[in-house]
């Protein structure tokens, strides 16, 4: 079984925490490092959240703080979904885990340059860290095996009618990534919204128990609350975790190759991922776009990872 070496770039975030939990435990994934970016909340908060998750689950992977601001646009956060801390719901003990002193962008560049081209980048927040790394050291581009990202949509957005939050939070960074020539896999809203976590799913993970079962329950109960308050929904998707699912077994997710372009023009479509689903532009595809996911398989995978945190001694 081949292990996928990855750097997980995230902005924790409730679904980010689920992605961290899965990536750190599944035997197919070799989680080299976690890089943090501003997104769901400001960088000081997303960093603390990432460290808290790692400490609670005893994940001994280095954590690096990255870009505190988007490349150009004014910063936005998703406090309506993720709360004042960015990870409201769970109660963590006193934090002793610390971030590394190296900046996330430098870590990404140095790690890729020293690699054999076998590292996959998994950005599940705004693409600020990845884009700045690409601009600072273009020689990393051929070193990236693949980028598997959560962001965008070929249908409607969730932060504006046109744009999904991660892309809208830094469209210029997304433009850099989507024009980089690196192989891209995009888990957009059309796919991730299929992973609706219901009270039944929460109860299933609670029955498994352990620290990850408890954390999953606390995270998703809060998510269900904000999803109902904001959208009237009885469940909440775990967007970012789909990227980890794809890396573990891409057969669980159907993709379609498309040409994708990020709209960086000011106006109602700012931050939209324009996906040429029908191929009408005649441009070569640059992205595998997620279409459907086997949800039974996916929740089984989540349960497998949750179960992995139960101590047997």
From Swiss-Prot:
Top EC class, one word: hydrolase
Record-linked InterPro entries: I/U_nuclsd_hydro_CS, Inosine/uridine_hydrolase_dom, IUNH, Pyrim_hydro_RihB, Ribo_hydro-like
Chain positions recorded as substrate binding sites: 227, 239
Top-rank taxon: Bacteria
GO terms for biological process, alphabetical: purine nucleoside catabolic process; pyrimidine nucleobase metabolic process; pyrimidine ribonucleoside catabolic process
Catalytic activity from the UniProt record: a pyrimidine ribonucleoside + H2O = a pyrimidine nucleobase + D-ribose
Presence of the UniProt keyword Cell membrane in the record: no
This protein's GO CC annotations: cytosol
Cofactor(s) this protein requires: Ca(2+)
Xref: Pfam families: IU_nuc_hydro (PF01156)
Keywords recorded for this protein, A-Z: Calcium, Glycosidase, Hydrolase, Metal-binding
Residues given in the record as Ca(2+) binding sites: 11, 16, 124, 240
Annotated NCBIfam families: PRK09955.1
PANTHER family: INOSINE-URIDINE PREFERRING NUCLEOSIDE HYDROLASE (PTHR12304), URIDINE NUCLEOSIDASE (PTHR12304:SF4)
Family assignment from sequence similarity: Belongs to the IUNH family. RihB subfamily.
Complexes and interactors: Homotetramer.
Protein name (record): Pyrimidine-specific ribonucleoside hydrolase RihB
């Amino acid at each position: 079984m081949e292990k996928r070496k990855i750097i997980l770039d995230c902005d924790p975030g409730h679904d980010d925490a689920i992605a961290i939990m899965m990536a750190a435990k599944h035997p197919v994934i070799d989680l080299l490092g976690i890089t943090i970016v501003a997104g769901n909340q400001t960088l000081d908060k997303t960093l603390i959240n990432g460290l808290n998750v790692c400490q609670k689950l005893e994940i001994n992977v280095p954590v690096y703080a990255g870009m505190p601001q988007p490349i150009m646009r004014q910063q936005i956060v998703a406090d309506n979904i993720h709360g004042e801390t960015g990870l409201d719901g769970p109660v963590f003990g006193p934090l002793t885990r610390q971030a590394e002193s190296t900046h996330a962008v430098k870590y990404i560049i140095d790690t890729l340059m020293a690699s054999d081209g076998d590292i996959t980048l998994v950005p599940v927040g705004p693409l600020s860290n990845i884009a700045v790394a690409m601009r600072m050291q273009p020689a990393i581009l051929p070193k990236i095996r693949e980028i598997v990202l959560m962001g965008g949509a070929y249908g409607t957005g969730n932060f504006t009618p046109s744009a999904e939050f991660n892309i809208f939070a830094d469209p210029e960074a997304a433009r850099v990534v989507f024009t980089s020539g690196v192989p891209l896999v995009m888990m957009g809203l059309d796919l991730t919204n299929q992973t609706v976590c219901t009270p039944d799913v929460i109860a299933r993970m609670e029955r498994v128990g352990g620290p990850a079962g408890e954390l999953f329950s606390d995270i998703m109960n809060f998510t269900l609350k904000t999803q109902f308050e904001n959208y009237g929904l009885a469940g909440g998707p775990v967007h970012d975790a789909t990227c980890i699912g794809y890396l573990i077994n891409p057969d669980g997710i159907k993709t379609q190759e498309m040409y994708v372009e990020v709209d960086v023009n000011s106006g109602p479509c700012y931050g939209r991922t324009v996906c040429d689903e029908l191929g009408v532009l005649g441009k070569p595809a640059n992205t595998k776009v997620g279409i459907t996911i086997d949800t039974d398989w996916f929740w089984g995978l989540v349960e497998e990872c949750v179960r992995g945190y139960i101590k047997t001694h």
